[in-house]
UniProtKB/Swiss-Prot annotation:
ATP binds at residues 216-218, 225, 482, 534-537. InterPro entries: Aa-tRNA-synt_II, aa-tRNA-synth_II, aa-tRNA-synth_II/BPL/LPL, Asp-tRNA-ligase_1, Asp-tRNA-ligase_1_N, Asp/Asn-tRNA-synth_IIb, AspRS_core, GAD-like_sf. Aspartyl-tRNA synthetase with relaxed tRNA specificity since it is able to aspartylate not only its cognate tRNA(Asp) but also tRNA(Asn). Reaction proceeds in two steps: L-aspartate is first activated by ATP to form Asp-AMP and then transferred to the acceptor end of tRNA(Asp/Asn). Residues 557-590 are annotated as: Disordered. Its EC number is 6.1.1.23. PANTHER family: ASPARTATE--TRNA LIGASE, MITOCHONDRIAL, ASPARTYL/LYSYL-TRNA SYNTHETASE. It comes from Mycobacterium sp. (strain KMS). It catalyses: tRNA(Asx) + L-aspartate + ATP = L-aspartyl-tRNA(Asx) + AMP + diphosphate. GO terms for cellular component: cytoplasm. This is Aspartate--tRNA(Asp/Asn) ligase. The lineage of its organism: Bacteria, Bacillati, Actinomycetota, Actinomycetes, Mycobacteriales. PROSITE patterns: AA_TRNA_LIGASE_II (PS50862). GO terms for biological process: aspartyl-tRNA aminoacylation. Belongs to the class-II aminoacyl-tRNA synthetase family. Type 1 subfamily.
C-alpha cells in the first residue's frame, strides 16, 4: 500500500504516529514561509504542513488536484487553530517527505465552486472528486448492499438476464443493435427484464431479483435517462400483499441508511381516489390542499365554461392578495401545460367574491361557493373545467405549484403511499397524448404493461368492459415521485391472448413476438407477481439530490448525449458494412 492511513481517519489520539497519506491537493496556502495543504482522499481531508528544508521546497510546486503521497508525523494543532467543522480538525500532519504521484493540468472549473452541468458532465471524473457527488455514489453502493441483504434473508436468487434480446412492444421504443452475422437483423436492448423474469418463475426459481440495467429510446423529458437502473423482483405463489410486504421491508432498510425510521405498513390509496383528491397518480402527501369536485355544485349553472364533463377547484390560502400581474402569470403557467387558462375567484376579506369568473355566477352559486370548496376570506379559488383527466391533471399541477410558492412543503418530511386498484386499460389515444407509446393497434392499451393480471372480479369481463376493468397492480409513491411499480402477472395463455387481442395484437402477431412466453405458460406456469423499483430515483431521494444524474456515475445530458465521450457518434463506413446495418430485408421467395 502506498499509504498507512486514510486522510479522514486521523484524530488527536493518533498524535506522535508516523503516517503515510495519499490523495489529492484540495487547497494550498502559503503562510509566512510555511505551506499548508488540505489532502483529500475518499475518506475525508487532513491538513498537512510543510515547515522547512527540502520538503518545503518541494511543496512550492504543488497545485490544486496534484495527486501526492506524504509522509509525516501526526501532531495536535496549536490551540486556537482547530477546525471543528471537519472530523480531522484537531490534528495536522507535519510532513517529512513528499512524492508527486501525478500532476494536474489547470482545472476547467474550481472543485469548490458551482459549475455548469455541461462542464461537470464533460469532466465527470473531476466532478466526482467533490464531496457531494462522490458521497452520492458511495451511498448508492450502500443502497445496493442493503437491498441485497434483505432479499438474501428471504431466499431470493440474484440472476442476470440478457441485455441483448429481440425487440418486443413494451411501451417505449427499443434501442437496436445490428447482428453482424445476420445482416438486416437486430437485437434490442431490454426496456426491462419483464419477460425473462416471468420465464424464471415458470422455470421454478420462485424468488428472483436483479439490479438491472434498462434502456428506453424515449423523446426528451426532463430528468430522464436513456439507460437507467431498476431493482427488479419477482415471486411465485404470492398475492399483491406478499409483494408489498417484502417491498416495504426493503424500503425500511434503505431509509434507515439516512437515519429515518420508516413506519410500516405504508398507507394505501386507490387510483380513483388519488385522481379525485390530488389530480395525479403520484400524490405528494406532505401537505394538504386537496382538489374539490364541483360538477354537482354547478349542475344548474348558466356559466358555459362550467357546463363541462368535469369541474373542480383547488384553494390557494391567502391567494386573493396576489397582484393582477401574478394572476395573469398563472394563465401563462396553465397555457404552458396545454390548457387555455386557469379560471379563478378571489374571496374578499368580507367574504364577497371577485375576479372575472364571479360575475358569471348566480347569486346562489356566489353565496355557497366558498363553503363548498373550503375557502376562507383572503383565499383564491382556482378552477379547471373540461375532460376529467386533463382538468384534474391541471389542478394537480396547480396544487403542487401553490405549495411551492407558499412554502408549504417540509423538505425533511417523507410521505409514502401505495396506489392500488389501477385501471387495466386506457384509451390508446390518451396514452399517446400523454407521450407514451400505445402498444398494439387497438383502441385500448395497457396502463402498466400487457402482462399485468386483471383483478379476479374483472378477469371474465375485461374484454367486454375494458373501461371498468381493474388491474392487480400497485405503485409506490414517495413525496410525489413514483419510485416503484408492480403487479400480479398473467400466468395463463388464454388470459394473455385475450389481453393481447384487446390491445389489437392478434393471434399471429402475438405468436411471432411473444410466442416463447405464451408457449411457456402451457407448461404449468405458477401464479406470480413482482415489482421494479426506480433505483436512480430512490438513490437521488436518499441523497437529497434534485436530479437522478447526480447519483449516476457517468450520466447522459438531458438530450441523451454524453459530453464526456461524445456519444452518440457516427460510425465509420467500414463499421457500417461489417454491421450489416444497411442490409435490405429479403423479399418472400428470395
Amino acid at each position: 500500500m502506498l499509504r498507512s492511513h486514510a486522510a479522514g481517519s486521523l484524530r488527536p489520539a493518533d498524535a506522535g504516529q508516523n503516517v503515510t497519506l495519499a490523495g489529492w491537493v484540495a487547497r494550498r496556502r502559503d503562510h509566512g514561509g510555511v505551506i499548508f495543504i488540505d489532502l483529500r482522499d475518499a475518506s475525508g481531508v487532513s491538513q498537512v504542513v510543510f515547515r522547512e528544508g527540502a520538503v518545503l521546497e518541494a511543496a512550492h510546486r504543488l497545485r490544486a488536484e496534484f495527486c501526492v503521497a506524504v509522509e509525516g508525523v501526526v501532531e495536535v494543532r496549536p490551540e486556537g487553530n482547530e477546525n471543528p467543522e471537519i472530523p480531522t480538525g484537531g490534528i495536522e500532519v507535519n510532513a517529512t517527505s513528499l512524492t508527486v504521484l501525478g500532476e494536474s493540468a489547470p482545472l476547467p472549473f474550481q472543485l469548490d465552486d458551482e459549475a455548469g452541468e455541461e462542464a461537470r458532465l464533460k469532466y465527470r471524473y473531476l466532478d466526482l472528486r467533490r464531496e457531494g457527488p462522490g458521497k452520492a455514489l458511495r451511498l448508492r453502493s450502500k443502497v445496493n448492499a442493503a437491498a441485497r441483504e434483505v432479499l438474501a434473508r428471504h431466499d431470493f436468487v440474484e440472476i442476470e438476464t440478457p441485455t441483448m434480446t429481440r425487440s418486443t412492444p413494451e411501451g417505449a421504443r427499443d434501442f437496436l443493435v445490428p447482428a453482424r452475422l445476420q445482416p438486416g437483423s437486430f437485437y434490442a436492448l431490454p426496456q426491462s427484464p419483464q419477460l425473462f423474469k416471468q420465464l424464471l418463475m415458470v422455470a421454478g426459481m420462485e424468488r428472483y431479483y436483479q439490479i438491472a440495467r434498462c434502456y428506453r429510446d424515449e423523446d426528451f423529458r426532463a430528468d430522464r435517462q436513456p439507460e437507467f437502473t431498476q431493482l427488479d423482483m419477482e415471486m411465485s405463489f404470492v398475492d399483491a400483499d406478499d409483494v408489498i410486504a417484502v417491498s416495504e421491508e426493503i424500503l425500511k432498510a434503505l431509509w434507515a441508511l439516512i437515519g429515518h425510521d420508516l413506519p410500516t405498513p405504508l398507507p394505501r390509496i386507490t387510483y380513483a381516489e388519488a385522481m379525485h383528491r390530488f389530480g395525479t397518480d403520484k400524490p405528494d402527501l406532505r401537505f394538504g390542499l386537496e382538489l374539490v369536485e364541483c360538477k354537482e355544485f354547478f349542475a344548474d349553472t348558466t356559466f358555459r365554461v362550467f357546463q363541462a364533463p368535469y369541474v373542480g377547484a383547488v384553494v390557494m390560502p391567502g391567494g386573493a392578495s396576489q397582484p393582477r400581474r401574478t394572476l395573469d402569470g398563472w394563465q401563462e403557467w396553465a397555457k404552458q401545460r396545454g390548457a387555455k387558462g386557469l379560471a379563478y375567484v378571489l374571496v374578499g376579506d368580507d367574504g364577497t367574491l371577485g375576479g372575472p369568473v364571479a360575475k358569471n355566477l348566480t347569486d346562489a352559486e356566489r353565496d355557497g361557493l366558498a363553503a363548498h370548496v373550503g375557502a376562507n376570506p383572503g383565499d383564491c379559488i382556482f378552477f379547471a373545467a373540461g375532460p376529467p383527466k386533463s382538468s384534474r391533471a391541471l389542478l394537480g399541477a396547480a396544487r403542487i405549484e401553490i405549495a411551492k410558492r407558499l412554502d408549504m412543503i417540509d423538505p425533511d418530511a417523507w410521505a409514502f403511499t401505495w396506489v392500488v386498484d389501477w385501471p387495466l386499460f386506457e384509451m390508446a389515444e390518451d396514452a399517446t397524448a400523454a407521450g407514451d407509446v400505445a402498444v398494439g393497434s387497438g383502441a385500448w392499451t395497457a396502463v402498466h404493461h400487457a402482462f399485468t393480471a386483471p383483478q379476479p372480479q374483472s378477469e371474465a369481463t375485461f374484454d367486454t368492459d375494458p373501461a371498468g376493468a381493474l388491474a392487480d397492480a400497485y405503485d409506490i409513491v414517495c413525496n410525489g415521485n413514483e419510485i416503484g411499480g408492480g403487479s400480479i402477472r398473467i400466468h395463463r395463455r388464454d388470459v394473455q391472448e385475450r389481453v393481447f387481442a384487446m390491445m389489437g395484437i392478434e393471434h399471429d402477431e402475438a405468436q411471432e413476438k411473444f410466442g416463447f412466453l405464451l408457449d411457456a405458460f402451457t407448461f404449468g406456469a405458477p401464479p406470480h407477481g413482482g415489482i421494479a423499483f426506480g433505483w436512480d430515483r430512490i438513490t437521488a431521494l436518499l441523497a437529497r439530490m434534485d436530479s437522478i444524474r447526480e447519483v449516476i456515475a457517468f450520466p447522459k445530458s438531458g438530450g441523451g448525449a454524453d459530453p464526456l465521450t461524445g456519444a452518440p457518434a457516427p460510425i465509420t463506413p467500414q463499421q457500417r458494412r461489417e454491421s450489416g446495418i444497411d442490409a435490405k430485408p429479403k423479399k418472400d421467395g428470395e
